[in-house]
């Protein structure tokens, strides 16, 4: 079944502008509360001007351009402006530092970068090192340096025509993006995403949440992340909805923003839910228009129940990763939701639980979650310039090895156990970090928790818990270990605990465990 029908991203925006015209497409709110708004017609014009800007700077079909930006309308302009001329976006996590960013530039052979003034000093050093192909920087901001090889994005973009001047032949098989994975355990890999992938993501995710053109989809997820792009922006635009993009997350402001924009759909990660729950309760907590809150792993049953009861919302669970493009397993329209299940497989996909010999397992047995899709269409095409890594993850028949552990029940509902790399081998027993984290997070003094395995000469690995306490709380080792012993099997009780003020996280809220070992 081909639901894309040969429509590339250039055709998508031309069609949307013609169909929805003056209807609001994008609302952006900065940290300072400044709001910028664009209709479908005006947003398409901004995209065309940006495409013409890239052409003016020498970018042609197949060229790669990096974006190092926080959430802003210019990210949207660049993303689709590059796609319209067949060029390739390489988004860079805005939290990365110089060495990490330079590594991505080098590995994707990027010569042009779009970034903001705050990141310019880092890239000036990278250019001076001559360690990457980077030779031109286009800066977004007001007060910009007059350095060689630097241009002013807004000034140049404003001079461009609103009509596209370069229209090379495009195919839905063309690469639209190289998105580097978060690399929480190793160097990131460049996930190759096609025009078809993005168009399919729009239709699929809109189906998953039954999105309509009168919906308002609000997100604070970073635009350089697959979630914002394929679970929020693409479905919102594909359905003709209004997409509300917030610059950054504020626990104090978020629920007011939900009400302010009359959002009907939003998305939350566990960190957001936990920080929202520590805000003072108000009589207006349940006064909103939300019908769905997209949710991504992991949350304890107590946390989930407390959140849904206080705010009067329901969570729509979705499971996926950069390589799957969308949430390929999740709560489906019309399905009964079966917490803590991550849902059932979505349309066009197959899913199996497999053992270490790559054989399918029956219901109830834990193994690796494997997904079957079509490379370059419903799942990623390949890892950029890494054929061996591609071959390890992706079978010729389209089966993707996720590296995650889970099981399914007799009714086809799937359950996530843990990232396979997060399973701790302790004296012959396999211990799930997520299971322990969910148990320990129920302690009333604990705000945040992560469990890791550390080397142990006798038992292979020992278990260590890193803890963030609620403000003003204290917790002794004796109290902590007593709680664990009363709530889990003896072999699962951590050997060590460490109290910290915070935990290292990447852009999507995932804890960077390699920084804790």
UniProtKB/Swiss-Prot annotation:
It catalyses: 4-(trimethylamino)butanoate + ATP + CoA = 4-(trimethylamino)butanoyl-CoA + AMP + diphosphate; crotonobetaine + ATP + CoA = crotonobetainyl-CoA + AMP + diphosphate; (R)-carnitine + ATP + CoA = (R)-carnitinyl-CoA + AMP + diphosphate. Pfam families: AMP-binding, AMP-binding_C. GO terms for biological process: carnitine metabolic process; fatty acid metabolic process. Pathway: Amine and polyamine metabolism; carnitine metabolism. Keywords: Ligase. It is an enzyme of class 6 (ligase). PROSITE patterns: AMP_BINDING. One of its GO terms (molecular function) is crotonobetaine-CoA ligase activity. CDD domains: FACL_DitJ_like. Belongs to the ATP-dependent AMP-binding enzyme family. This is Crotonobetaine/carnitine--CoA ligase. The gene is caiC.
């Amino acid at each position: 079944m081909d639901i894309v029908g040969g429509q590339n991203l250039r055709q998508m925006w031309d069609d949307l502008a013609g169909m929805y015209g003056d209807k609001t497409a994008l609302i952006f709110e900065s940290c300072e509360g400044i709001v910028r708004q664009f209709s479908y017609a005006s947003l398409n014009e901004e995209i065309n001007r940006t495409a013409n800007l890239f052409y003016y700077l020498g970018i042609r079909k197949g060229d790669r351009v990096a974006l190092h930006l926080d959430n802003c309308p210019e990210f949207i302009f660049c993303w689709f402006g590059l796609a319209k001329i067949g060029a390739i976006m390489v988004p860079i996590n805005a939290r990365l530092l110089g060495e990490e960013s330079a590594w991505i530039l080098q590995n994707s052979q990027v010569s042009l970068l779009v970034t903001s003034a705050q990141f310019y000093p880092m890239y000036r050093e990278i250019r001076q090192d001559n360690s990457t192909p980077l030779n031109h920087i286009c800066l977004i901001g007001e007060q910009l340096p007059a350095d060689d090889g630097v241009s002013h994005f807004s000034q140049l973009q404003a001079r461009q025509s609103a009509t596209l001047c370069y229209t090379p032949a495009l195919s839905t098989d063309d690469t639209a993006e190289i998105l580097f994975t978060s690399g929480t355990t190793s160097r990131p890999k460049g996930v190759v995403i096609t025009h078809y992938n993005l168009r399919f993501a729009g239709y699929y995710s809109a189906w998953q949440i039954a999105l309509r053109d009168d919906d308002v989809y609000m997100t604070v997820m970073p635009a350089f992340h697959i979630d914002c792009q394929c679970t929020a922006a693409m479905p919102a635009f594909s359905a003709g909805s209004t997409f509300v993009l917030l610059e950054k997350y504020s626990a104090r402001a978020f629920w007011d923003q939900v009400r302010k924009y009359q959002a009907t759909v939003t998305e939350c990660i566990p960190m957001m839910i936990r920080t929202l729950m520590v805000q003072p309760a108000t009589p207006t907590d349940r006064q909103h228009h939300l019908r769905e809150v997209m949710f991504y792993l992991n949350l304890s049953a107590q946390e989930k129940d407390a959140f849904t009861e206080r705010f009067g919302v329901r969570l729509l669970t979705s499971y996926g990763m950069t390589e799957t493009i969308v949430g390929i397993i999740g709560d489906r329209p019309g399905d009964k939701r079966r917490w803590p299940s991550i849902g059932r497989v979505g349309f066009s996909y197959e899913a199996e639980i497999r053992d270490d010999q790559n054989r399918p397992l029956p219901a109830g047995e834990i193994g690796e979650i494997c997904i079957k899709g079509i490379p370059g269409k419903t799942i990623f095409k390949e890892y950029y310039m890494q054929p061996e890594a591609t071959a390890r993850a992706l079978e010729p028949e389209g089966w993707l090895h996720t590296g995650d552990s889970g099981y399914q029940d007799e009714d086809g509902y799937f359950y996530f156990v843990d990232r396979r790399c997060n399973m701790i081998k302790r004296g012959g027993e396999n211990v799930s970090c997520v299971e322990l984290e969910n148990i320990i997070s129920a302690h009333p003094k604990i705000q945040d928790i992560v469990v890791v395995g550390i080397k142990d000469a006798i038992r292979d690995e020992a278990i260590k818990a890193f803890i963030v306490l609620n403000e003003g709380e204290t917790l002794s080792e004796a109290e902590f270990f007593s709680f664990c012993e009363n709530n889990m099997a003896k072999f699962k009780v951590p050997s060590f605990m460490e109290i910290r003020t915070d935990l290292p996280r990447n852009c999507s809220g995932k804890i960077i465990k390699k920084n804790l070992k």
